[in-house]
Design a protein with these regions (language model features):
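Asp-box/WD-like beta-propeller blade repeats and closely related beta-sheet repeat scaffolds
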Residues: 139-156, 169-209, 219-249, 253-255, ...
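Short, conserved, GDST-rich strand-edge loop motifs in beta-rich repeat architectures
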Residues: 109-123, 223-251, 412-429
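Gly/Ser/Thr/Pro-enriched helix-cap/hinge segments flanking short amphipathic alpha-helices
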Residues: 56-58, 68, 78, 387, ...
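Hydrophobic beta-strand segments that make up the repeating blades of beta-propeller
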Residues: 103-110, 162-171, 217-221, 298-303, ...
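Bacterial N-terminal signal peptides
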Residues: 39-52
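Blade-edge beta-strand/turn elements of extracellular beta-propeller
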Residues: 61-64, 135-144, 185-195, 265-277, ...
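Repeat-based blade/solenoid architectures
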Residues: 70-92, 142-155, 194-205, 251-252, ...
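Beta-propeller blade termini
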Residues: 90-100, 129, 150-165, 179, ...
Length: 585
């Protein structure tokens, strides 16, 4: 039985039970600062290693895939030799509780091959029902998930407000919208809803952009890429002296889509009339969050080899594109990057969401700190992410408190685009290891992945976090290219106290867009409920907090998408709680 919190009353559950004008530094100034901090980086990292939190000592990530039941999923996308760009984009993954039994399930998005796609494609996803102990059963066909094509990404949310969790799949050729019928069954309603477009979509995110009480949808679209006119390898498509597949540069991009929900199951694309993505950039990861604390959901789009997009929601139906003005469009040197995955968190607990996105090799991933005045400062090198990510091609990324010490850490998965990378010099590899950045406070991170048992190399794409075994720490699932996924159990991450907060709207739906604050020891942590994040993926919708040695949270508050608020005081830790939105009367 789920915990319930309403109007300040709470029933507790025990561990293991179910869930009850912007002023910012110029590019030259930021680059100068980066050069200064690089000279101090070696000494700083040594100091951080010495001061590494005792909370994370003994933390290990254990690969439990062979015993999980997930090994039957094949992440093959196209040919092994990767002749075309569509064959390397990979797929997303989601932790979700589709049957509301309190145990996390896993959804993996599947691609196809060009030959198979011409015959109708493969099943776009596979759904695995979890038993709470680490075993997952393939229920794809039983659940009615029969749409075929070339799957790419996933976003989760209750678009029809019936209290059951639905999901949206992006893909090449067509997208799919699955409505949850209950009793473990789904129906595909994309065409009926008006969102089964025939082109190449990658990222997606549900959010109530107009705050009318139902979930709208943003979709990032990539390339116009007809299979009967695929660009072939030639001398014009060259990377470090090797002929490689062509794209995306030189190929026509597609406008992103902004679908507004009419509340009756129909969506209308208003992107053109709202001047969304007029330049038709190469859209990949999408992250919806309230970056300026005005209670309206804003949009960040990580674009491939073109400027990123940052849409501020003005609350009147208009979105203002401010990427250049906010400092989120380019690298700290003013250069376009190959940006892919994205996440946001309040890394310094100042009440403002900071931004992180992954990039291609020789670019380093980007850590942008929110100044609270409508601008961001690039602290990639100053925070410990520059040198550590320089030779990696980053994809999935997720913030989370991996050791329950009350600071949000960061997990990044990698893998090069080109099989030819193994022939490059300068340390590049096709398969690459994963990175774990532990947050040591003062905006400082230390990469410790190998120390935590992550030395294997993969061609990884999608990444999601969630506590699948209900032991109070965050576990990891990764969708790999050309192979089975990886399920990592977090061992030792639950030494500190924890809390999982499940937020539910009046209709019983997961409260996508809700903001959750938890205060203990005079410090406040911030989380937001998001339908998607990372690279084409979705984390558990329940919000996880770590509290270190604390015994209770002084206060837990929720700001609902409707604008209402709920506040709980003196909350016992090491449990799952459900907070229900108060009625509107």
């Amino acid at each position: 039985m789920a915990d319930s919190v309403q109007a300040g009353r709470m029933r507790e559950s025990k561990p293991g039970e179910g869930p009850v004008a912007l002023s910012h530094p110029t590019f030259m100034q930021r680059n100068g600062r980066a050069r200064q901090v690089r000279s101090l980086l070696t000494g700083l990292l040594g100091l951080l290693a010495t001061l590494a939190s005792a909370q994370s000592q003994g933390l290990r990530f254990v690969d439990v895939t062979p015993a999980s039941g997930l090994e039957g999923f094949d992440g093959l996308q196209g040919s092994v030799s990767k002749q075309h760009i569509i064959e390397v984009m990979g797929g997303g993954v989601a932790f979700l509780d589709f049957d509301a039994d309190g145990r996390l399930d896993i959804l993996l998005v599947r691609g196809s091959t060009i030959e198979q796609f011409e015959r109708g494609g493969d099943l776009m996803c596979a759904l695995y029902r979890g038993d709470g102990s680490g075993s997952f059963e393939d229920v794809t066909l039983r659940a009615g998930l029969t749409a075929r094509g070339w799957g790419q990404g996933v976003a989760v949310g209750d678009f029809d407000s019936d209290g059951r969790l639905d999901f949206f799949l992006t893909g090449y050729g067509s997208n799919a919208l699955y409505r949850n019928l209950g009793q473990g069954r789904f129906e595909e309603v994309g065409r009926l809803a008006g969102i089964a477009r025939s082109h190449w979509s990658l990222g997606a995110s549900f959010a109530d952009f107009d705050r009318d009480g139902d979930l709208d949808l943003y979709v990032s679209n990539y390339l116009a890429y007809p299979l009967d006119r695929l660009p072939q390898r030639d001398a014009n498509c060259n990377y470090r002296g090797f002929d490689v597949f062509c794209g995306p540069r030189g190929l026509p991009g597609l406008r992103d889509s902004l679908y507004l929900n009419d509340g009756a199951g129909k969506f209308t694309d208003v992107a053109a009339e709202r001047s969304i993505d007029d330049d038709r950039l190469y859209g990949l990861g999408v992250l919806v969050a309230d970056y300026n604390n005005d209670s309206w959901p804003d949009i960040f789009v990580a674009n491939d080899l073109t400027a990123n997009l940052f849409y501020q929601n003005n609350g009147d139906g208009r979105f203002e594109e401010l990427a250049v003005l906010t400092g989120t469009a380019f690298s700290q040197d003013g250069v376009e990057e190959g940006s892919m995955g994205v996440d946001a968190a309040d890394i310094d607990r100042d009440g403002w969401l900071d931004l992180y996105y992954t990039n291609s090799s020789y670019e380093s991933n980007s850590m942008l700190v929110n100044n609270g005045d409508g601008s961001f400062t690039n602290l990639t090198y100053a925070s410990g992410h520059g040198e550590s990510t320089h030779l990696f091609v980053g994809w999935g990324v997720a913030f989370g408190d991996l050791d329950n010490d009350s600071r949000e850490d960061l997990f990044v998965v990698n893998g090069h685009l080109y099989p030819e990378a193994d022939r490059f010099e300068m340390g590049l590899r096709y398969e690459q290891r994963w990175l774990v950045f532990m947050n040591h406070g003062d905006r400082q991170f230390l990469e410790r992945g190998e120390e935590f048992g992550l030395s294997e190399r993969y061609k990884s794409r999608g990444l999601a976090l969630g506590d699948y075994d209900s032991d109070g720490d965050l576990d990891v699932v990764v969708n790999n290219l050309d192979g089975p996924p990886t399920l990592l159990r977090n061992d030792g991450g639950n030494r500190g106290a924890w809390l999982l907060v499940d937020t539910r709207t009046e209709s019983g739906s997961p409260a996508v867009g809700a903001r959750v604050l938890a205060t203990s020891g005079g410090s406040t942590q911030l989380r937001e409920v998001r339908s998607s994040a990372s690279y084409l993926s979705a984390n558990d919708l329940r919000q996880h907090f770590g509290f270190g040695p604390d015994a209770r949270a002084e206060q837990v508050s929720v700001r609902w998408p409707s604008g209402r608020t709920s506040t709980l005081s003196d909350v016992e830790l090491n449990q799952v709680i459900t907070v229900e939105e108060p009625d509107g009367e």
